[in-house]
Swiss-Prot record:
One of its GO terms (molecular function) is acyltransferase activity. This is L,D-transpeptidase 4. It comes from Mycobacterium tuberculosis (strain ATCC 25618 / H37Rv). The record marks 325 as: Binds to carbapenem drug (covalent). One of its GO terms (cellular component) is extracellular region.
Amino acid sequence: MPHWAEERHRRESNYVALEAGLDEGESIRRSEHSRSGCGADAGCWRCRGGPGRGSRRSRRSRGPGGTAGPVDPPAVDLLAPPPDPLALPPALDPLAPPPPDPLAPPPPDPLAVPVAAGPVAGQDPTSFVGPPPFRPPTFNPVDGAMVGVAKPIVINFAVPIADRAMAESAIHISSIPPVPGKFYWMSPTQVRWRPFEFWPANTAVNIDAAGTKSSFRTGDSLVATADDATHQMTITRNGVVQKTFPMSMGMVSGGHQTPNGTYYVLEKFATVVMDSSTYGVPVNSAQGYKLTVSDAVRIDNSGNFVHSAPWSVADQGKRNVTHGCINLSPANAKWFYDNFGSGDPVVVKNSVGTYNKNDGAQDWQI
């Protein structure tokens, strides 16, 4: 072969080798190997890349600079049987957890701040915007207070309100959780708001009265139910019975029955003087009295308390002997005094009549 033809053949062999993924040195060796008259023999040291060097496969597995190059595909077993299209899938492990649902909502963030779900009847979680239609009012409960679940919101104005609807629209009540409720007026200078049912335990309540703001919280749902049919007071905390006390309520003689209804704690005194003359009964009359009592918890503005009465312990749990108050033993009255606070409800049932006096504490009868 002429020299120029041999050189052309060598270059063409290099191009073919480079396109097949071989480096230039390997292509030169192939060219020399072909000129030497050797066939493509796997046992030839030339075909293996020369003495002391790796095979062609090992050299192809290295890229430029010694880095990993393309890897040959795995071998296929031509004798393996084809997959059975009718074969059943492997049985699921009944103890294995179900796979996650890609459409399921993400779990709640335990660190997220609770937000009211939206307005309900009587509530408005938005901030008041605009000129205030009244001077800054005062609130009860006071800002930051912890109260019972029967506590209403009391808003006192500096001057009488002529347009009550406008005033109500400027007062935004909201709570977490949201609960429906209503406004009601006690006087031209006082409006109140309460939920239709007791506040849930541990509720956060916010008030925005034309830009004057306040907030409070409820504690546990502590409820006393005085049942005149059994002469027992049952106390529940968050729906679970915690205490049952024998009691005595208002006697029939003289019309002193304790009326049915929902009361709530207004205030309490370690000791207080009770004087029948304060409601028109002379102290020296047959129904009169004047004595000092302990652990007295006021539940209305008509003279009714839950209090200690050591003189009526023998009657408690059996009969009614009081002038309207709820008598407890000294130990039970002390527990009641220590645990019940502002806004905790006292429900009287199976008695006579209904609590309907306009004494400023009849919120749950309105």
